[in-house]
From Swiss-Prot:
DNA-binding residues: 192-232
Known function: Transcriptional regulator which binds DNA consensus sequence 5'-CCTTAAC-3'. Plays a role in establishing and maintaining asymmetric cell fates in chemosensory AWC neurons during larval neuronal development. This is achieved by repressing the expression of multiple AWC (OFF) genes, including srsx-3 and hlh-11 in the AWC (ON) neuron. Activates expression of sox-2 in the AWC (ON) neuron.
Naturally occurring in which organism (per UniProt): Caenorhabditis elegans
Entries under InterPro entries matching the protein: HD
Intracellular or extracellular location(s): Nucleus
Primary location: nucleus
Record gene name: nsy-7
Protein name: Transcription factor nsy-7
Keyword Transmembrane helix: no
UniProt keywords, alphabetically: Activator, DNA-binding, Nucleus, Repressor, Transcription, Transcription regulation
Biological process (GO), any one: negative regulation of transcription by RNA polymerase II
Highest taxon in the source lineage: Eukaryota
């Protein structure tokens, strides 16, 4: 045993339906010496393996550990092993040994209010149970669910690891853009492209009886329905006319009407002017004739 290698035991309680997932995760992380038991009473925790001179009891249990290890190596997805000899009261060992891993490797453990750790503390050194059980209620947030069981004391963040789906897509120019349906820095909520049925019904209830919503009502719709002002106004414009908005003006029609009015007002004056010019011309002609005859 190398003096630089440190070993610890981990007692983990997981649901029966998550045994396969948990075992696959442990093997993928390099933990090979793993055994499953039905209850903590079947566990025989040997002495601290970090001691230079292991006791005789640890040597006597070593054969069962190697047997469990070979069984887990040959059949990784095998069901929990049970004792075949009914006379033996200590059939298996629940342990997790680190092989070729740094000292800061994470060890999954479970939060539990079970008094079993207190019963084991009489026969097991206290340092082996450190950080394995929470004996006092903590104000820290609950650990996240990991493959069906609670994991505390994890040294790495799975959300930033291979389990996290990256929403950024390369555009071919060496830069990245955000997925159109994923959250981004400008809008944390996913992009909504279509109104839902309850949102339509809520707006219809507000604008019933041809009531156009006020500014306060529009702001209330924005908050409760989580819609933009543009989406709301477009939905209302298809069903109601905004009374506060002036009707649209056709400038071509307006110019034509103005021209017609101008023409209708200018016709009588033009006729009078033309008649006066004709009379004056006749007077000039008559005067010129009288002068020539005289």
């Amino acid at each position: 045993m190398s003096s630089d290698t440190k070993y610890k035991y981990a007692v983990v309680r997981i649901p029966e339906t998550s045994v396969v997932d948990f075992f696959s995760l442990i093997v993928a992380k390099g933990y090979s010496d793993v055994s499953f038991v039905a209850s903590l009473s079947q566990c025989n925790l040997r002495d601290d393996p970090n001691d230079d001179q292991p006791t005789t009891s640890s040597n006597s249990v070593k054969e069962s550990i190697n047997d469990d290890e070979s069984n887990s190596e040959n059949n990784k997805l095998s069901p929990p092993r049970r004792q075949s000899n009914p006379h033996s009261s200590l059939p298996a060992i629940s342990s997790s040994t680190v092989k070729n891993e740094p000292t800061d490797s994470w060890t999954p453990s479970a939060l539990s209010n079970d008094p079993t750790p207190d019963l084991l503390s009489a026969t097991v050194p206290a340092e082996l149970l450190t950080n394995l059980f929470a004996k006092t209620k903590s104000t820290e947030p609950k650990p996240q669910q990991l493959f069906g069981f609670q994991a505390s004391g994890v040294d790495f963040d799975l959300s930033n690891n291979e389990w996290h789906e990256n929403l950024r897509l390369p555009n071919g120019n060496g830069t990245e853009k955000y997925h159109p349906y994923g959250g981004n820095s400008k809008n944390d909520s996913p992009l909504q492209t279509r109104m839902k049925g309850w949102q339509r019904e809520y707006i219809k209830e507000v604008i019933k009886d041809s009531h156009y919503p006020t500014e306060e009502e529009l702001r209330d719709i924005e908050q409760k329905c989580d819609l933009s002002r543009k989406q709301i106004l477009r939905f209302i414009a298809k069903r109601l006319t905004n009374p506060n908005r002036k009707p649209r003006v056709n400038h071509h029609d307006e110019k034509r009407k103005e021209q017609e009015e101008r023409d209708s007002l200018a016709d009588p004056d033009d006729d009078m002017i033309n008649d006066n010019e004709a009379v004056t011309n006749l007077h000039h002609i008559l005067n010129s004739l009288q002068e020539t005859t005289a």
